[in-house]
A protein has these predicted regions:
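Conserved SAM/AdoMet-binding glycine-rich loop
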Residues: 1-84
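Radical SAM enzyme [4Fe-4S]-AdoMet core and its adjacent flexible, acidic
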Residues: 1, 39, 48-51, 71-252
């Protein structure tokens, strides 16, 4: 179904003949590099001259952990976002995670010397939750470490995303991982003009959204939805134009 959807959208153009489909984003309901048909998806996109926008947990399993595998991803993606959750939750040792990020950047540096530009951007994706954003002082110091790591390697961007809960989530889960909005505001200020400001790494993510994606209307359209130009294609082929997790997995189903 993914092939049919990609081919259909890739054929649509605006009034000036420009293709409307800009990139393809593999689902992050699992590790994309472990999907049985990921290589097929990559081939379809390469044939259509489309870039992938990839989010990975940083494990780079199988052939994707080799230099040639990383180089192929760098040439086929518009952005490779590496999530920090994999080592925060114990799924991947930090030493292996950081080593893989360093190797990816080394591969990009070598490839840039040969091919020039046109290679993928590399980003870190950080989820802000109650276990890493417990109080102001500790959170700023923790975030400084991530920023320094990114700056030293030449990472292009850090996506800072707020934790999102479903309505049915238990109070204990919210108490453990929830974050006071005042701390989010403090982080924004520190990143824009304080101790976390960086001249080398760009910042993005839901921390900077005008409207919290977790609070948007489930039944309607948000006033300023950052995903309004995206189409979500499910395994059975049906399409969705709203990424709100409450709409898909909350009590509304």
């Amino acid at each position: 179904m993914a092939r049919a959807a990609i081919e259909r959208y890739a054929s649509e153009c605006d009034e000036y003949g420009n293709r409307l489909l800009r990139e393809v984003i593999p689902s992050t309901m699992g590790e994309p590099l472990l999907y049985s048909k990921f290589n097929e998806l990559l081939q379809v996109c390469e044939a259509k001259s489309l870039k992938l926008n990839l989010t990975t947990n940083g494990s780079f399993p199988g052939p994707w952990g080799s230099d040639s595998g990383m180089e192929r991803l760098l040439g086929s993606c518009s952005d490779i976002k590496i999530s920090t959750l994999s080592y925060e939750t114990g799924g991947l040792p930090y030493s292996l995670w950081s080593e893989n990020v360093e190797r990816l950047m080394q591969c990009r540096n070598r490839a840039e010397n040969v091919t020039g530009n046109g290679l993928s951007k590399v980003s870190l994706q950080v989820t802000l939750h109650g276990q890493n954003a417990a109080n102001e002082m500790a959170t700023v110091e923790w975030a400084k470490g991530i920023v320094r790591f990114a700056e030293n390697l030449g990472i292009d961007r850090i996506k800072w995303n707020r934790v999102v809960f479903l309505e049915k989530n238990s109070p204990s889960l919210r108490e453990r991982f929830g974050v006071d909005n005042r701390l989010f505001e403090m982080l924004r200020q520190e990143m824009q003009s304080g101790a976390l400001r960086s001249s080398k790494v760009k910042y993005g993510g839901s921390l900077f959204f005008e409207q919290d994606a977790g609070l948007c209307s489930v039944g309607g359209k948000c006033d300023a939805c950052p995903f309004e130009n995206e189409v979500w294609v499910w395994p059975d082929g049906h399409e969705d134009h709203c990424p709100n997790p409450e709409r898909r997995w909350g009590n509304s189903l």
